[in-house]
From Swiss-Prot:
The lineage of its organism: Archaea, Methanobacteriati, Methanobacteriota, Stenosarchaea group, Methanomicrobia. Its EC number is 1.1.1.25. Belongs to the shikimate dehydrogenase family. It comes from the Archaea. InterPro entries: Aminoacid_DH-like_N_sf, NAD(P)-bd_dom_sf, SDH_C, Shikimate_DH, Shikimate_DH-bd_N, Shikimate_DH_fam, Shikm_DH/Glu-tRNA_Rdtase. GO terms for molecular function: NADP binding; shikimate 3-dehydrogenase (NADP+) activity. The gene is aroE. This is Shikimate dehydrogenase (NADP(+)). Involved in the biosynthesis of the chorismate, which leads to the biosynthesis of aromatic amino acids. Catalyzes the reversible NADPH linked reduction of 3-dehydroshikimate (DHSA) to yield shikimate (SA). It is an enzyme of class 1 (oxidoreductase). Homodimer. Transmembrane segments: none annotated. One of its GO terms (biological process) is aromatic amino acid family biosynthetic process. The active site is at K66 (proton acceptor).
């Protein structure tokens, strides 16, 4: 019988994780299948315990479940996930433990490195203060970036900045409201959108327009559906370098794949699969 893996979230119909992971399982000759499951926050406890009872191999968690997972007393988060305050990967261990990890930050870091973007010393604006933003902020602070988190609710941005600062990482960080975004972008080296603005089906929304961007900027949108979000289109008009959310999706997925199986994931194949699905 095939071993089942999956992604829990709401909404989750847009997810390309099933195509990506199923291509990897197939290429490696593994008798496994990966599905997307719509799960609301109030049902997360039952859903994860149900998956364990049915012998699932592992799970990914996406919006809005990453932070909710840490509230569950049966999940054993690793130190990084606990520090970030969000779990995106669940492993059902042979000892019976349900372990929580966060691979989002590593995925974002690898995406920037593949695009030949210098992180250390760069001035980075992170838009959003949710689970993905926390992962990105902790990772880039560890890599020595100077980060400003901007969020519609300023208190959440400030709280995130305080959490990262308390970890005594090499980078610097502060938080502010969205009203300061335009001014911050003038001096920024990297803009990372971790909000859902621009995600299908609301593809005409964006955190910033071409007039607010500049050619010395790298614009990284973690939204990957559509492949070219409105933010990335605006960035191209401004002459900025762009980094697709596909890369973060692939590299966080590759990290999760290895945690579940102990096997190196075929990342290039996974990227090819995602790009083909988005361009279909």
């Amino acid at each position: 019988m095939k071993r089942v893996f999956g992604v829990f979230g709401d909404p989750v119909g847009h997810s390309l994780s099933p195509a990506m992971h199923n291509s990897a399982f197939s290429a490696l000759g593994m008798d496994c299948i990966y599905h997307a499951f719509r799960v609301r926050p109030e049902n997360l406890r039952k859903a994860i315990l149900g998956a364990e009872a049915m012998g699932f191999g592992g799970l990914n968690l996406t919006v809005p479940l990453k932070e909710e997972a840490l509230k569950l007393d049966f999940i054993r988060p690793d130190p990084l996930a606990e520090r970030i305050g969000a779990v995106n990967t669940v492993v059902f261990s042979e000892t019976g433990e349900i372990r929580g990890y966060n691979t989002d930050g590593l995925g974002a870091r690898q995406a920037l490195l593949e695009a030949a973007v210098e992180i250390r010393g760069s001035k980075v604006v992170v838009a959003g203060a949710g689970g993905a933003a926390r992962a990105v902020a902790f990772q880039l602070a560890a890599d020595g970036a100077e980060i400003t988190v901007v969020n519609r609710t300023e208190e959440r941005a400030v709280e995130l900045a305080k959490d990262v600062a308390a970890a005594s990482l090499p980078g610097k960080i502060n938080g502010t409201g969205l009203s300061g975004l335009k001014e911050l972008l003038r001096d920024a080296d990297i803009l990372i959108n971790t909000t859902t603005l621009g995600m299908h089906p609301n593809t005409d929304t964006t955190i910033a327009t071409a007039e607010e961007l500049h050619s010395g900027l790298t614009v990284f949108d973690i939204v990957y559906n559509p492949l070219e979000t409105r933010l990335l289109k605006e960035a191209k008009v401004a002459g900025a370098k762009t980094v697709s959310g596909v890369l973060m999706l692939v590299y966080q997925g590759a990290e999760a794949f290895k945690l579940w199986t102990g096997v190196e994931a075929p990342a290039e194949l996974m990227k090819k699969t995602v790009l083909e699905a988005l361009q279909a």
